[in-house]
């Protein structure tokens, strides 16, 4: 029997998952540990790892030699020797009987998985060995579709606490791999907390706010944060740490976990004289002062979700250049004034600052997605626009003179100073969940799963009742992200409901 495409596990190896002997005269004595940056760029979820382990055991039991391969999109592939085609069919049939969904995207390629999202399934290829050459159904990270056997070296790679047969350099760091740590910061507020609502209402009565900025939509929450964090765990597992910037009590479902940290404003505002704040613009102007935050990080709101597996290169180049996503929506003419929303005003303040500094006029908003930032650039901006940062930092509510650092001041400043570029590869959707048209697209998003990100925004001028919105959004999120993250409590009290909103009310 040939063993060109890998080797067979012994009975003890199937139990221990420890592949440290050779077979068929092939030397698998070298075990290369996958560098952290390579493992991160693979963006492999727990669901995928579990299915890889299952298929590995089944192939070993069927005595089918195989290799672990990284494809051109950094997806993991099991490459089996086509001489064992009949046994591979038995393995896939057994997987289907065990609950795997099996599809065949092209000849000699089978996709298998138990997750409802095919992006987390494992692909199994059949490689043909013709004397001194090997033919693959597709190119991969290392080889073309046809290569000489003499040009490759068989080895093992340590990945997911196991050793896997592979080809030398298959998992070596590549110039396009992002090799630095990336954290994420979420801003969040529990609008159902009675103490918070009373304090906010009392202080808001003393100020003038823009259109829609006093609406409950600014603070409503139906556990979106729980699902946003689930989306990180599943679709961006390379993120090192999660910070939640909030002065609300920790959500009941959140347990102590080394990867998740609650950050209070008093601990990261450079000047605390303006606290408490109810202004997300103020919070966003102080992210660079969060202790322990990585140089490169993402910022997100609790209504933004990672919809499918994404790699670090979605946000940064290997050189650390950030990649941001412009929206088709134009900022529009006119200056900031108290009649506009805080969102629209901040875009105009940003535009004026950048025009004065660089002589360029920005015209577009950014998409509602997680955005990449660098602490060093933020600190530089805080010095460059010191008065604007200070004014926004001390603004308790959104004001007509606020800057919006994360949308879009940072990104265009970084672009105009050579530290950012726009990108058009991401597929995104913005959904107003208080509109009937918005709710109507949720099932399509779940069915197609072809987006990288989606935002489920809570509009300030609803067409539907709050109870209907809560029911439909909760149903959608529970179906899209059903698997708890490791930082969730086994059971937690239900959230406190907000007072019912009347359709059409602000």
Swiss-Prot record:
A GO term for molecular function: transferase activity, transferring phosphorus-containing groups
Keyword tags: Exopolysaccharide synthesis, Transferase
Pfam families reported for this sequence: Stealth_CR1, Stealth_CR2, Stealth_CR3, Stealth_CR4
Region (Disordered): 484-506
Superkingdom of the source species: Bacteria
EC code: 2.7.-.-
The UniProt record lists the keyword Transcription: no
Extra remark: Stealth proteins are part of a protein family that is conserved from bacteria to higher eukaryotes. Family members were first identified in microbes as proteins that help pathogens to elude the host innate immune system. Microbial stealth proteins are involved in the biosynthesis of exopolysaccharides. Stealth proteins are predicted to function as hexose-1-phosphoryltransferases.
Protein name: Exopolysaccharide phosphotransferase NFA_48680
Organism listed in the record: Nocardia farcinica (strain IFM 10152)
